[in-house]
Amino acid sequence: MYADIIVDITHEKLDKVFQYRIPSHLEGMLKVGMEVVVPFGMGNKEIKGYVTGFSERAEYAPEKMKEVLKIAEESVAIESKLVALAAWMKESYGGTMIQALKTVLPIKKKEKAKEKQKVRLLLPEAEGKEKLELYLHKNQKARARLLAALLDQPEQDYDFLIHKLNLTRSVVRALEEQKVLALESEQVYRNPVIYQQKEQKEIIYTEEQQAAIRTFSKDYEQGIRKTYLLYGVTGSGKTEVYMEMIDKVLSEGRQAIVLIPEIALTYQTVMRFYTRFGGRVSILNSRMSQGERYDQMERVKKGEVDIMIGPRSALFTPFERLGLIVIDEEHEPTYKSEQVPRFHARETAIERARMEGASVVLGSATPSLEAFYACECGRYQMLRLRNRTGKQALPEVYVADMREELKHGNRSILSDRLKVLMQDRLEKKEQIMLFLNRRGYAGFVSFRACGYVVKCPHCDVSLSVHRGGKMVCHYCGYETQTVKNCPVCGSPYIGGFRAGTQQIEDLVKREFPQARVLRMDMDTTKNKGGHEKILAKFADEEADIMIGTQMIVKGHDFPNVTLVGVLAADMSLYSDDYRSGERTFQLLTQAAGRAGRGRRPGEVIIQTYSPDHYSIRMAARQDYEGFYEKEMNYRDLMGYPPASQLMAVLMTGSDENKLTTAAEYLKKYAIRVSADGEVQVIGPASPSVGKVNDVYRKVIYLKSEEYQVLVRIKNHMERYIEINRGFANMRIQFDFNPMNIF
């Protein structure tokens, strides 16, 4: 018997199956997905690899074939279904098989189990009381305290007893030696959330919610598995619909995965699921320790979990009876991986569901154009929620033209109308959210006399100013002190866009000194639990104003928020990215949706220098379909997804001349292997950031109406790169329908 092994070396030339003989002592023990140790290369170096299959017949002389040495210690096996999914990901998105296998492995190695010690009384009650009298008679007070506590409660936590009774460990050992008590260990799970299942209040669903639940349940009962788009306005009760769908799936003996963007994966959100489903729920997120993540996967394997909630990585939870995958806020760009393989959770979830006979539900108030287009084409079924629950009205939205504010002498980033409304809300003890679509204290630094922009010496990007007199590169982390004079002309006059969250906070505190202000951005939430602490403070009304970047608009529900101000609404509108209009519309609509979710009506002020742009006009009207029609006309005209398919080929190397030459050769090859008129090849060009960490970058774009045509060309290009030395010392990655233009 022979094992097919993918070795753990990320190199295109080694991206193939290697056959090894299975020794007699491992026969019957190896399974697909197991990590093993094998001899590799001329020197028979011991390396790890994964079993991807078995065969009865040797592909070459059996006497020359090497043997599998052993099963890797502390390894975690990949479920065989996920090995098949990894193969699909490699084929669909590029990269090597070992990269795909490591992607579908939620945890990389075993962690030591956490144990809890208990103390148990061994003596019958009468004998124990006699022993207690003896200890008291001998004035052995510590032993007497311990025995008295155990007579009161025969089994207790070891650490609790030590601290509560002020005992030394030698006292416990002495009674253990006398056979008075026994010390026992039991495994305890490192659970990231302490939950308490509560009695459910009866939920009265709207007719629209009931219709969505009925459609899904009827299909599920009939064995129909498909992809649904739950398109509902902000506050329409999508989460309640998800939970009813999950309940239906659980009643059929199946399991569910709920994907939520990391930025929206808050305690408040998770507790809604714990309250409904109790201990059958688990969670994954990047803030958990390796031990916590390992314990949750162990619970999954033991069948103790039926619902896994988490970001993109939770998609690979090894459930045996997967019945449903929910992707909340499906439009979020974080569902697309920026690491090889550059997979999208939406397409990968649909493929996993197809393999395992499950359904997929995508939810959003602002669906991605891809999802809405798929509904129009009949690939997904749309379920609509047009109204908020509780008959709450959508907030009134006003657009403030900042050009007019300048004409009237207002140079503040806060419009006059926003200031008036903020004062009004503060007097009424209502809460306010101010959203700024950027990070940091200020943007780029330029000198007005000559226009020089201060850039990172290692990357082709401008430095951002942070409080404390530092300029920081957000690509490589380079830091330097803020310059006072221009290094080119010596001018001291500094310009640039100076509106970061820190400066907004300073401005608000000056304008409204009586207000309690919270700031939520990457800097204030970098510590574990920082995100939850800020949200909890705001939810408990310990602050009047929350200022933040896009993380404050992601699905949070604060009933006392009646005013939302969107500052610099068009900051994301003029980036060199074909999705900029869509992203702007989504952010503005999601931000507006935070207002008026309680009993009091909400108002939204959108501040912009581009009030006539359709993304801003449609967001102010909460008109998704109007926006979709305009944006699809643009995508059709330009040949951008979803109207056609796009593949980016990103090439990096330390020698700029060699990289430029190699990119030209690769472009010519792509044209040669594509049929006439089937593919449009654009580039090669330098991306907007042409150099990062002293490594140069080039990009080639390929457009086609058919996704599989691009996959076929990608396969041709991979083989061409593998056999040509001109691509040595270069890194080449493929990205299908990229979320970010390079």
Language model: regions and residue ranges:
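Solvent-exposed, membrane-proximal periplasmic/extracellular interface segments of envelope transport
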Residues: E59-A72, P687, V692-E705
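A general secondary-structure junction signal
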Residues: G53-S55, L105, S185-Q187, L436-R438, ...
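A carboxyl-terminal module marker
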Residues: K668, R672-V692, Y696, I732-F736
